[in-house]
Design a protein with these regions (language model features):
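Short peripheral tails and domain-boundary helices/loops at the edges of structured domains
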Residues: 89-109
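Conserved "cap/hinge" positions at secondary-structure junctions
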Residues: 74-75, 230
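Non-catalytic DNA-recognition/assembly elements of restriction-modification systems
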Residues: 1-18, 143-227, 316, 320-366
Length: 367
């Protein structure tokens, strides 16, 4: 794979707008860096929006199309993602588009190459240090090179890696649907009930973790490691087992749930419940998530979760019979969600192992 081709011979590269429009509740998508994950996916939950009038202005440079590769070139560097079907929106600041115009290049293969360690290492050498933020030169980007291999081999590589990603996406979709069903059951069964206790009456706190997120990023352990971010990392040893909730303690409110052995970071509060109420506790916390942000996260600058305040929140505590009926319905759902999460972690490890091997030719695909 020593032969290479210059990007400008196969692609067009477009810089995005250099300003931020007024955000709206709905309308065309304003695609910001926050909506692109570290592992190369578009997270629609992070979409912002702008008006139709501003959309016209913000797409003068380029209108994102299905199959375009979007990448970040300033501040948060090196994020790449594919523009999905039916995307209607514009690029945000510090983003650019790579548009394949060659029949000899498979766009999906090119996308995966940009996620490879080889490319990441190369881009690291091209970073321009700034007084406030670092950046990659969009002007120089078209002069960089990628491997020049046959379209047949490109398609084989892309097919294998995309099949893994499709299975991960399917599991995530199943999990989203199961969570929505469990939440509906909770709301139908308990919404509007008169409080008869406090959160601290059912709360069980796990020991505080001493492991920083940065340490876990270097780990290749087998246990899921929960943080105050969206990504689930890995750790060598579990801190807890059973049915546990993991809450952000800084920034914005978020709650995760997992069944099984797991670990967590210093900025994550791990809690469960006595009386077999952990699943109930999780859905209760999800139901008050806006309140968590507005009332229980306080402080100047970076806000932090006020645990004593939250513990004293009045809640409804169901009796044994109601809880038993509820658990019979939702426990199996969360068991499946956690099984899918475990499978996804294994698939991610497989994909990330295969990616560099396929790209540098150490692994080949037979017909």
């Amino acid at each position: 794979m020593s032969e290479r081709i210059v990007i400008k011979e196969i692609c067009e590269v477009y810089d995005g707008p250099h300003a931020t429009p007024k955000k709206t509740v709905d309308g065309p998508v304003y695609l910001g860096i926050d909506a692109i994950t570290d592992d190369g996916k578009i997270n629609a939950k992070e979409f912002a929006h702008l008006s139709e009038e501003d959309y016209i202005k913000w797409t003068k440079r380029v209108t994102p199309q299905y199959g375009d590769i979007v990448f970040s070139y300033e501040a948060t560097l090196g994020r790449y993602a594919l523009i999905p079907k039916d995307f209607y929106g514009c690029l945000g600041r510090r983003l650019a588009i790579i548009r394949n115009v060659s029949k000899d290049i498979d766009t999906l293969w090119l996308y995966y190459y940009f996620l490879s360690p080889e490319w990441k290492q190369f881009i690291q050498s091209k970073i321009i240090k700034g007084s406030t933020v670092n950046r990659i030169s969009v002007e120089d980007f078209p002069t960089y090179t990628v491997p020049n291999i046959s379209i047949k081999v490109q398609c084989k590589i892309a097919n294998i890696l995309s099949k893994i990603d499709e299975k991960i996406a399917l599991n995530n979709n199943i999990n989203d649907n199961l969570l929505a069903m469990a939440y509906d059951i909770y709301m139908y069964s308990f919404y509007g009930k008169i409080p008869n206790g406090k959160l601290k009456d059912i709360l069980v706190e796990a020991d505080k973790s001493s492991v920083q997120v940065g340490e876990a990023k270097q780990s290749t352990g087998e246990y899921p490691f929960f943080t105050s971010g969206s990504a689930i990392l890995k750790w060598d040893t579990p801190f807890v087992n059973g049915r546990n909730c993991f809450l952000n303690t800084g920034g914005n409110a978020d709650v995760k749930f997992y069944v099984g052995e797991a670990a967590y970071s210093t900025d994550t509060w791990c809690i469960s419940s006595n009386k077999n109420m952990s699943d109930y506790l999780y859905l209760l916390l999800i139901s008050i998530k806006p309140e968590l942000n507005q009332k229980f996260f306080q402080g100047t600058g970076l806000k932090h979760l006020q645990k004593p305040l939250l513990k004293n929140r009045h809640i409804y505590i169901p009796d044994f019979e109601k809880l038993q009926i509820f658990n019979e319905q939702v426990n199996p759902m969360f068991n499946v969600i956690s099984e899918n999460t475990r499978e996804n972690q294994e698939l991610i490890v497989l994909r990330d192992w295969l990616l560099p091997m396929l790209m540098n030719g150490q692994a080949t695909i037979s017909d």
